[in-house]
Amino acid sequence: MKEKTAPKKTWLQTLRALWVPLAIGIVTVTALALVVGAVWQDYRTALMTSQTRQMELVVQSTADSIRVLLEEYADRLDSIAEKVAADAGLRPTVARSDTIRDVWLENSNGEVVYSCYELSAVCDVLITRTEKISYWQYHSGDEHYLVMKKQAGGKTVCLVVDATVMYQQLISEIHVGTNGYIMIKNDDNLVVMHPEAVQWGIKVVEGRQRIYKDRTLDLSSLSELLRAQQEEEAGTLDYYSYWWTDPSLPRVHKISAFRHLKVGDSFWIVSAVVDYDLSLIHI
């Protein structure tokens, strides 16, 4: 007696038999991908929060250090100015330090009529004028100087600070990310200190357009950042700009953590800048 043969599966049954486990596999993989994606997004968010917090702490510490130094210089300048005001013929002296380089006297025309150590430098730009003290940027060769001035009778006492050394000691050795840096601007977006010496004393937007006039620069995002930094005392913002320390001038997504540094009745802006993507790798 012949055995009955099993009925052959139709192509639809075969397709269904293949697609059911395949569909289950696809759903499983998709679910895993969603879970992994959610976990990665949570990790990325947590990492970014941690990194920006570190940047904020770096900016706070830097601003505090600069404030202490400026107060020390202001006290030194006040002391010298009081002596000059009391004795019109006084030829003031100052003890040199790592950053204090000289003391000058200027006449009513702004001409240096006395220099304790005979240091000469060229005046570049007024950085900040407060009620009692004005802050100026000078240079001599590759050296930049912060010159703090105060009226004393018919003369102006000038304390000459080596801003290049000040930047090197307080700021340039601080590592922010793999290629980040710290810069300082005044309340009118004039660069006070920057890792690129050519940018000292220039306006952040207009000066860079002049320096890189052979390049077509999109500084719209940077301009928005500057407006926000003027209005807010501290914060962390992302924007698009260029790596000014890279000769190829690549346009990148950046993060800036910033804080106002009070200077008399004005302020400077201390800003830490890193590459947005690289900041997720290392700070």
Language-model-derived ranges and their functions:
Residues 1-15:
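Non-catalytic regulatory/interaction regions at protein termini and inter-domain linkers
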Residues 11-89, 99:
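Juxtamembrane extracytoplasmic/periplasmic/luminal helical "stalk" adjacent to the first N-terminal
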Residues 78, 102-104, 181-183:
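Conserved beta-strand cores of small sensory beta-sandwich domains that regulate signal transduction
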Residues 86-99, 156-212:
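Solvent-exposed, extracytoplasmic
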Residues 106-173, 178-181:
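Extracytoplasmic/periplasmic ligand-binding sensor regions of membrane-associated signaling proteins
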Residues 111-141, 199-245:
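Extracytoplasmic/periplasmic sensor domains and loops in membrane signaling proteins
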Residues 141-175, 186, 192-196, 253-259, ...:
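Conserved beta-strands of PAS-like sensory domains
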Residues 151, 155, 213-281:
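Extracellular/periplasmic juxtamembrane segments that couple receptor/chemosensory ectodomains to their
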